Every structure is written in structure tokens, then in C-alpha cells.
Amino acid sequence: MTTMSTTATDTAAPTGRRQARPLALTYAGLDLKRQLRDRMGMFFTVALPAFLFFVFGIGDDEAYGSANVAMYVMVSMAAYGAVTATTTVAGAAATEQTMGWGRQVALTPLPSLAFVAIKTAVAMIVAALPIALIYAIGAATGSSGNAFDWLASAAIVWLGSAVFAVYGLAVCLVFKGENAAGIASGLIVIMSFLGNLFTPMDGIILEIGRFTPLYGYAGLARYPISEGYLPNDAGHDPVWLLLANVCAWTVIFAALAVWGLRRRRERV
């Protein structure tokens, strides 16, 4: 009897994994299509950052570091679009879990880790869209820099946006209901101003901004161009300061996400 039950367990596990693989691919494809068909979401994630680049950066060929001002603005707007994308997708995933979709997923052979991996992959794919569009517009309209500037800044913008997937998850786990995603996106706009993404800051506002979540990420994305020097002779940010900002906020967001998840589980 023991041998039969052990054999059944051993054969069930591989079968479950085999079922989970095509299910994971199917779910990932469906989720990506759903994100791309969300016209309002795509507007704020892709079209709005591109429009802001048209307004603030196109055609400004004044030299800035190893590039020009147009490229500096291009990187900033791509960063804004990327973090908006990862925040939106991750926030939606957290909301789905709290609204009961998590129970439906739990009934399928799809493991929790696979669900998280799918949502992360979809978030990063969506984040690549505003980066690709804005960089293409920049290349066609006079943004100039060397090959390293283009490749390094794009890579940092894309990879660094993953931090804000954790942020979106944290906010939507801490706050209740469908409005949580709106709160997360609204805070991104405020943090973008303080993070020197929309307009160069100076004085006390700049000093406050150095401690906000987007400051380190944006500074690192523009570091290949600026080497840490700020516009309007507002000072210099060493790379260790920018890295410390990103690491500190990553830990804070992760801690908030864990706390929010535990609190919700305790209420169930």
C-alpha cells in the first residue's frame, strides 16, 4: 500500500509540472495581451511619456556631458514611462490577489512562484515599450550621444524599473480596493517631480528630492551621460549616493510588500 501511494505521489508531481508549463505560457500570453489592449493604461504608460518628451526635449542640441540636452530629457521620460509600466502591472497583480483572483489561480496547477514570475515578466515587457518608443523618437529627432550612452542608459532604465514593480506591489497590498493602483500611479507623478525627472530642481527642493525613491534611479540612468553632474550647476551626485538611494528604497518597498501580504493573510 505504501509503495503504491509513493509511486502515485512521484508520478503526480511531474505530471503537475508538465501541466503547469503550457498553462504558464498561456497565462503569460493572455495577461500580456490584456495589458496591451488596455488603451487607457497604454496611454499613460507609452503615449504620455512620449508626448512629454516632445514637449520638453526634442530639438534641444545644447551639449550636456557626453551627449546633449535632448538625450538627457529622453532618458528621463523613458524612465518615467518604464516605472509607470512596472508599477501599473505589479499593482494590478496585487489587486487581483486581494480581490479573489488569487483563489481562482490557486485551483490551477500553476505554482505561486510561476504566477509571480509571469507577472514580473509581463511588467518588464510592458516597461520596454515606452523605452523603445522614446529612444526611437530621440534617435530620429536629434538626441545625440555615443554608443555607450545609448546602450547603458537604456539598460539601466529598463532593469532599474523592476524596483517599482516591488513598489506597486507594496502600495496595492497596503491599501485596500481597486483605488490602490490609482494611488500608486499618482504617487509616481509626485515622485517624478521630486526625483528630477520632469524639471531640474535646486535649493531645498533638490535636497529633499535626493531622499525620494525616483532620484537614485533617474540619476543612475543618466549617469552615463552626466557622470553625476546636475543641470544648472546644481551640484554633483556621486554614484555611491545614487546606488544607496536605490538599495534603500528597494528594501523599504520589499518590507512594505511583505508586511502588507502578512496583514492581509491574517485577516482571511
How should these model regions be labeled?
Residues S112, V116-G182, V189, V239-L243, ...:
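Alpha-helical transmembrane segments and their short interhelical loops
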Residues V55-A63, C172-Y215:
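Transmembrane helix segments
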Residues F56-G59, A93, G102-V105, I137, ...:
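Hydrophobic alpha-helical interface/terminus motif in multipass membrane transporters
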Residues G16-Q19, L23, Y27-M99, K119, ...:
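Transmembrane helix-boundary elements of multi-pass transport/secretion proteins
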Residues Q104-S112:
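Short helix-to-coil transition segments within interhelical loops
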Residues T2-R18:
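Short, contiguous pre-domain boundary segments
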Residues T84-V89, A162-L169, L194-M201, G219-I225:
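Juxtamembrane membrane-interface segments at transmembrane alpha-helix termini
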Residues T2-T6, P22-T26, L197-G235, V239-W240:
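Short hydrophobic, aromatic-rich alpha-helical segments embedded in or entering the lipid bilayer
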